[in-house]
Amino acid sequence: MVRVARSVNARKKRRSILAAAKGYRGQRSRLYRKAKEQVLRSLVYAYRDRRKRKSSFRKLWIIRINAAARMEGVTYNRFLQGLKLANIELDRRSLAHLAVHNPDTFSALVGVAKDSLKNAPDPVAAPRLRGTSSRT
């Protein structure tokens, strides 16, 4: 029976793992087993955080829009409501960009939102009877 020579493949695999672990601290960049564990964990973190990054940026955009809107005297919620009433469909990313880089344009949008809030009809709430719920 012929032996299977795998030294080339094994060396290539080890070299690729150690190359991926380059820059890690201590044994994690030098010892194969430790490096392999850390590289696998790093790939898990990378996968998870690619999804997490989307919500992190959305939170950042909302914070920036809220801060800029409050400087103009309106809250984030009322500002977006006013934009919706004015049929202005800008996403949070572009609104945050305008708030940071083009404050004049953003304040014009705030003015439009305020005007549409003033001119909007008040929503009339239906009177609720005591003891009844809206769920059926």
Curated annotation (Swiss-Prot):
Disulfide-bonded cysteines: none
Cellular component annotations (GO), alphabetically ordered: ribonucleoprotein complex; ribosome
GO biological process assignments: ribosomal large subunit assembly; translation
Pfam family, one: Ribosomal_L20
Domain of life: Bacteria
GO molecular function: rRNA binding; structural constituent of ribosome
Keywords, sorted A to Z: Ribonucleoprotein, Ribosomal protein, RNA-binding, rRNA-binding
Family: Belongs to the bacterial ribosomal protein bL20 family.
Task performed by this protein: Binds directly to 23S ribosomal RNA and is necessary for the in vitro assembly process of the 50S ribosomal subunit. It is not involved in the protein synthesizing functions of that subunit.
Protein's name according to its UniProt entry: Large ribosomal subunit protein bL20
Organism: Tropheryma whipplei (strain TW08/27)
Taxonomic placement: Bacteria, Bacillati, Actinomycetota, Actinomycetes, Micrococcales
